[in-house]
Design a protein with these regions (language model features):
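Peripheral/terminal regions associated with large enzymatic or DNA-binding modules
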Residues: 1-99, 104-338
């Protein structure tokens, strides 16, 4: 059996999409990490069973010296709280870990990059996570291989147990009047998502631990920074008809969103060029907000109209109806938390 190449744990979350998962596993096999945590949600119905079985066959193809842990659920928990459950599980056994979902295809050097960052910044409380995805693809004018940002993507990331231990799965911060006022002011000052607090209220009402809002809240309250590679290291395969967060296909996404699913991924060269200071790259934050349309209502409106046109063009009337219903429900529920 071949020896491992990089001494770093990796958590892989998957469900019933063997085609996407096989691309992720192929890159993991090329990197050969020392430890794997495999998490699979359970079936919603018998129709999921063939895909679930096929995914397990993919993950059985581990042909190097690797410590493997598996958590295969018997029942279906859904994307949330499966994300939270799997991450707490992995970080309960290791102090640092890389996290990949079944549609996050990393460059091979991403694993060594994360290993070096996890070791270098392990004791630095300013650093919350290491991202693999760069929304700009290549951030111009940066003379280093990575920089620091207050905004980040969770499409392939790594962090430490010290960070995950700060997570508040019960959203108790919503009951803290003073610190909620501070959070509201911080969100306004940073021009962060206006619906973030609404999302937190909605998630606690659903009685589920949604790790994205839990993670972002922890990062905001603790003034955390993310490490972002200067050149993108992740491809996301999530814009498909069976994806969790997107409906239809990449062809019906507005052009501004489509590019983030079609951009290149790059390999980083070692030794890394390290930044001289730990300071936020504000220009990157502004660029990401513009790309995602956060704080740019006219960009949002334009993309909504573009998406409507594309779905009409492709005859996706059920998606249009669902989107309208979701938008109305969102407006109505948001009013309850004002």
């Amino acid at each position: 059996m071949k020896p491992f190449l990089v001494d770093v744990p990796v958590l892989i979350l998957f469900f019933n999409r063997p085609q996407q998962l096989s691309q992720v596993i192929e890159q993991v096999r090329n990197a050969r990490p020392s430890k794997l945590f495999l998490y699979q949600d359970g079936p919603r119905s018998e129709h999921d069973l063939p895909g679930i079985k096929a995914c397990r066959e993919v993950t059985d193809q581990i042909d190097w010296d690797c410590e493997v842990h598996r958590m295969y659920q018997e029942k279906n928990y859904g994307c949330d709280p499966s994300e939270y459950i799997s991450q707490k599980w992995a970080f309960s056994m290791v102090d640092k870990c890389i996290v990949l979902e079944d549609d996050d295809v990393p460059s091979v050097s991403f694993f060594t990059f994360c290993k070096e960052m996890l070791d270098k910044y392990e004791q630095d409380p300013r650093i919350t996570m290491i991202a693999g995805f760069n929304n700009e693809e290549i951030t111009p004018g940066v003379p280093y291989d990575y920089f620091f940002a207050s905004t980040f993507s969770i499409w392939g990331w790594a962090s430490w147990k010290r960070v995950i231990d700060q997570w508040d799965e019960h959203y108790t911060f919503l009951e803290d009047k003073f610190n909620m006022q501070q959070l509201e002011q911080l969100i306004k000052e940073r021009k962060f998502r206006k619906d973030f607090i609404y999302m937190c209220h909605r998630h606690i009402e659903n009685n589920k631990a949604y790790y994205e809002t839990i993670f972002h809240a922890s990062m905001l309250f603790n003034s955390g920074l993310a490490i972002v590679p200067t050149r993108n290291m992740i491809n996301n395969l999530g814009a498909t008809a069976d994806s969790t967060h997107f409906a239809g296909s990449v062809h019906t996404l507005p052009k501004g969103y489509r590019r983030i699913f079609t951009m290149k991924r790059y390999e980083v060269e070692f030794p890394l060029k390290h930044p001289r200071y730990v300071i936020e790259n504000v220009a990157y934050k502004k660029a990401v907000y513009r790309i995602m349309g956060w704080g740019h209502p006219w960009i949002k409106i334009g993309r909504s109209l573009e998406e409507l046109f594309l779905n009409l063009r492709y005859g996706n009337f059920s998606i249009i109806t669902k989107a309208i219903k979701n938008r109305i429900n969102k407006w109505l529920k948001r009013d309850q938390h004002r």
